[in-house]
UniProtKB/Swiss-Prot annotation:
Gene3D superfamilies: 1.20.1270.10, 3.30.420.40, Actin, Chain A, domain 4, Substrate Binding Domain Of DNAk, Chain A, domain 1. This is Chaperone protein HscA homolog. It holds the Pfam family HSP70. It comes from the Bacteria. Chaperone involved in the maturation of iron-sulfur cluster-containing proteins. Has a low intrinsic ATPase activity which is markedly stimulated by HscB. PANTHER family: HEAT SHOCK PROTEIN 70KDA. GO terms for molecular function: ATP binding; ATP hydrolysis activity; ATP-dependent protein folding chaperone; unfolded protein binding. Belongs to the heat shock protein 70 family. InterPro entries: ATPase_NBD, Heat_shock_70_CS, HSP70_C_sf, HSP70_peptide-bd_sf, Hsp_70_fam, ISC_FeS_clus_asmbl_HscA. The keyword Chaperone applies. Keywords: ATP-binding, Chaperone, Nucleotide-binding. GO terms for biological process: iron-sulfur cluster assembly.
Length: 622
């Protein structure tokens, strides 16, 4: 039975002349993808109409995996193989990840970035993030009807070089061309500014699942200038969950170390649900039955929760004060405060922001979607889809100073924090000893004065310096930061012209060979993924055809004689029985049989409709 496909207004594929690009918010708790369609940025939903994809991946044996909602629902029954909040691990070693000791995972000793052992092998945070990004890419291509030319992916403003590079590697592994990495508060400002025609000084308070950012922006006639940025890449909604989790355990006289991993995950899920419920209700219940048979039942009031998390709320105000000082403005100068991130729905956060800035925060845009919407606008522009009203300029900044190690383990800052990017700065250095023919250059990031207190980004050597007395050689070191906030360093000896350079790829243990291996692994599972996709498509088409045929039989079953009706009923029953199975070829064959078996029925229905439409009308009226 042939179908006529009609798109809802605004849901048709983009015109062929537009280059399809999307904005992706790769979040700690949830992720989403957005695109500009008919000049309006919108979040793209999945088949069930949900725009948020839980940032959860469950690994199964034999290469299987669950991603998003399905994985989240199974986290409590298989916590060791279900990776949540992976964004906290990006570009980080185990010692740098807060709460790693309480996580249910088996961590693997590896240089640099932490690794997690699963039933499907050892996985890096880059691989886990790539699964999420690939799912969003597929959603976008299915919705938009064509391949993507690229994506703008958002990152916390306070992400350092290692975390940014890890994000780009994950995108590359997911088959995405990264047009730009965009700071999340800046993306929110783009969405808010363009949507509201806002001008003046604005603060963007971004509290997500695992990170906190505070940016001060100046919006003037299409120019988005970031004046200062601050934050904490290890503070987010997850920390509020863990505080409440510890409180519930303490009230019950239990310790986390004594719980089974399944119970830890289950209780964390219940606690998170209670936290979210407290945003709308004065109290919430936590009811859990542990694997030991013990039951926990507690009532949490909003006041109790507010008192419990007050230290975390105050932690967000420290970077806020610092950013205001860096921008040389006061809280009274701020015209509006834009809230970003699901954690900002908590009344305790909104009350604290309102009190600090002396005004209620702006909440007219969905805090879960605003970052992705802004990224979509930037992606559309970078893809070349410029229209008359798109003449605007984005001036972003680097969140942390970039420097070089000098004698004594000191840091000489080359590019100070809050410098507008892209940017290049140079400084001259000299040799320390007579006859010195080489110089080791150690690139660091941070605000501290000692190298040991900053993050090491890269090391390289400049060799071939002509032997001279100490202090005679002149070595010019140039730091260059691109629009993604990623760094390249060049060194040149001025007398001889010898030079060396490095594109900083942080030492988190993921090299080109690792990327190649991961890509090869993804190719190996591509056939399995395609088979799963084909089966799902066959099941959906079968269900659609069964429902359409049954509706037609109810409306016009009298057009068939008893024998014909029996044949159609048998075809419908056969397809309905096969549809839930896992044989895509059999489902396709049954679908084709039903479609062909109802062709004559469809023709009779068409004749009936035409006769009904023409009944009582004269020839000259037609």
């Amino acid at each position: 039975m042939a179908l006529l496909q009609i798109s809802e207004p605004g849901m048709a594929p983009a015109p062929h002349q537009r280059r399809l690009a999307v904005g992706i918010d790769l979040g700690t708790t949830n992720s989403l993808v957005a695109a500009v369609r008919n000049s309006i940025p919108e979040a793209l939903p999945d088949d069930a109409g949900r725009v948020l994809l839980p940032s959860v991946v469950r690994y199964l044996d034999k290469g299987g995996r669950r991603i998003g909602h399905a994985a989240k629902e199974e986290a409590a029954i298989d916590p060791r193989n279900t990776i949540v909040s992976v964004k906290r691990f990006m570009g980080r070693g185990k010692a740098e990840v807060e709460g790693a000791a309480n996580a249910p995972y088996e961590f693997v000793d590896a240089p640099g970035m932490v690794q997690i052992r699963t039933v499907d092998g050892v996985k890096s945070p880059v691989e886990v993030s790539a699964e999420i990004l690939a799912t969003l890419r597929q959603r976008a291509e299915d919705t938009l009807g064509d391949d993507l030319v690229g994506a703008v992916i958002t990152v916390p403003a306070y992400f350092d070089d290692a975390q940014r590079q890890a994000t780009k590697d994950a995108a590359r592994l997911a088959g995405l061309n990264v047009l730009r990495l965009l700071n999340e508060p800046t993306a929110a400002a783009i969405a808010y500014g363009l949507d509201n025609g806002a001008e003046g000084l604005y603060a963007v308070y971004d509290l997500g699942g695992g990170t906190f950012d505070l940016s001060i922006l100046k919006l003037t006639k299409g120019v988005f200038e970031v004046l200062a940025a601050g934050g904490d890449s290890a503070l987010g909604g997850d920390d509020f969950d863990h505080l409440l989790f510890e409180h519930v355990l303490a009230q019950a006289g239990l310790e986390a170390a004594a719980l089974a991993p399944e119970d830890v995950r289950l209780l964390l899920d219940r606690v998170r649900g209670a936290k979210e419920a407290l945003s709308a209700a004065p109290q919430a219940r936590v009811d859990v039955k542990l694997s030991t048979g013990e039951k926990l039942a507690q009532t949490i009031t909003r006041d109790t929760f507010a008192a419990l998390v007050e230290p975390l709320v105050q932690r967000t105000l420290g970077p806020t004060r610092k950013a205001l000082r860096d921008a040389q403005v006061s809280a009274a100068d701020i015209k509006g405060v834009v809230l970003v991130g699901g954690a900002t729905r908590m009344p305790v956060i909104r009350d604290a922001v309102a009190k600090y800035f002396g005004q209620p925060p702006l909440v007219n845009l969905d805090p879960d979607q605003v970052v992705a919407l802004g990224a979509a606008i930037q992606a559309d522009l970078l893809a070349g889809n410029r229209s008359g009203g798109d003449d605007w300029l984005l001036l972003d900044v680097i969140p942390l100073s970039l420097g070089v190690e000098t004698m004594g383990g000191l840091v000489e800052k080359i590019i100070p924090r809050n410098s507008t990017i892209p940017v290049a700065r140079a400084q001259e250095f000299t040799t320390f000893k007579d006859g010195q023919t080489a110089m080791a250059i150690h690139v660091v990031q941070g605000e501290r004065e000692l190298v040991s207190d900053c993050r090491s980004l890269a090391r390289f050597e400049l060799r071939g310096i002509p032997p001279m007395t100490a202090g005679a050689a002149r070595i010019r070191v140039t730091y260059q930061v691109d629009a993604d906030g990623l760094l390249s360093v060049f060194a040149r000896e001025q007398h001889s012209g010898v030079e060396a350079s490095v594109v900083v790829k942080p030492s988190y243990g993921l090299g080109d060979d690792d990327i190649a291996r991961m890509l090869e692994d993804s190719f190996k599972t591509a056939e399995v993924d395609m088979r799963a996709r084909a089966l799902r498509e066959a099941q959906v088409e079968a269900q659609r055809l069964v429902e359409a045929t049954e509706a037609a039989l109810v409306a016009d079953g009298d057009l068939l004689d008893a024998s014909e009706r029996a044949t159609v009923d048998a075809l419908v029953a056969s397809l309905r029985a096969l549809a839930p199975g896992d044989d895509a070829d059999a489902i396709d064959a049954a679908t084709k049989a039903l479609a062909e078996g109802t062709d004559e029925f469809a023709a009779r229905r068409m004749d009936k409709s035409i006769k009904r439409a023409l009944a009582g009308r004269k020839l000259d009226e037609i």
